Curated annotation (Swiss-Prot):
Domain-related comment: Consists of two distinct domains, a catalytic core and a N-terminal extension that is involved in tRNA binding.
Cellular component per GO, a single term: cytoplasm
Places the protein is found: Cytoplasm
Protein name, per record: Serine--tRNA ligase 2
Amino acid sequence: MHDPSELLEDGPAAVRRLARRRYDLDLAALEKAVRRRSEAQAEVTRLRTELNRTSRARGRSGPPSEEEKEAARALRADVQQAEATARTAGHDLTELLLGIPNVPLDSVPDGDTDQEAVEVRRWGRPPHDAGTDARHHSDIGESLGILDGPAAAKLSGSRFSVGRGAGARLERALADFFLDLHTGEHGYTEYSVPFLVNRDTMTGTGQLPKFEDDLFRTQVGDRELFLIPTAEVPLTNLVAQQLLDARALPYAFTARTPCFRAEAGAYGRDTRGILRLHQFEKVELVRVCAPEDAPAQLELMVGHAEECLRRLELSYRVVQLPAGDLGFSARMTYDIEVWLPGSDAYREISSVSDCGTFQARRADIRHKRADGRKAPAATLNGSALPIGRTVAALLEQGVREDGSVLLPEALVPYTGFRRILPGGATA
């Protein structure tokens, strides 16, 4: 969420920056909402002052008359009405601000889609010459007997998956490998968090109110909860409504959770395989820091996600997203795209985003500086990594001419095997 005074002060510059992400900022509506709230708050202050003044005056002049009692009752009613008006004005301003996305950094390139992302670097090379025919991961997994799409469809419908035998073991191994790397070498603290959260928690990280159609919601009686679309939501909100000691920053959190997404805008896309599911597992990274440290923290987190892929010997590239393709809460994002021979393309496997103070203002995450000033902190988040997409990449990059899949050496301590053979046997 934004500080409205900053948006109004920036004026046309704020309009221009938000237009880069195809958002039309209505300065006149914002100014009207701010003025309405200010005037309502001023009226509350005026009436309370008047009520206090008359109360003190009556106390000095003896018992009040019936006329004075009636005047006092009327004044108290006016105060209550003014307070209600101020609450409404404040609510209306908050609702307006909650719908305004983060402002892209000036260094973010122009453009509207991931096709206009700017490549930053590559690691490895697309294994066209690996001596194998390019095959889609769903074909590989089903031929090995480790992915069962029909079973998933029978249980839950489209966009779900079932892993079996060595496939399920591989998923568990990847999650443990990622968590061990992040906690043992990258300095993150692991958390076990709820998968169901309330509306305030979803609002704090920016999923609500704008993206309610993309979320799975539960309702039991009058209790409403949402299934998390990413562990970013509970991890970031661990420090919601808190004043943090700047000397303790940065905080670094990680968690492995299932993620639930309705994928309302993805009709017809990636209907085969395990790239785009309603439910998938992911290891998430979240960092909370002083705002001036956010750029360096972003680069650090990208490096942590890249290290996962390098240890797994998976070819990938890093791209910077254009302004029009940024997530609602992000002011800058790097996507890491892994090479998928079966698609003959790089596909996103991680997004790492700098949200600046945007989420912190929504969730009331502040830090106390050395000089005593209290100010919003900065938040960052990134995938490192989603389990299903990593499995897809390992299958497509690791398949051999005999139909077996060779896994990276780094996973052997976690899987207990290096190769998955046709029929699901391991070696």
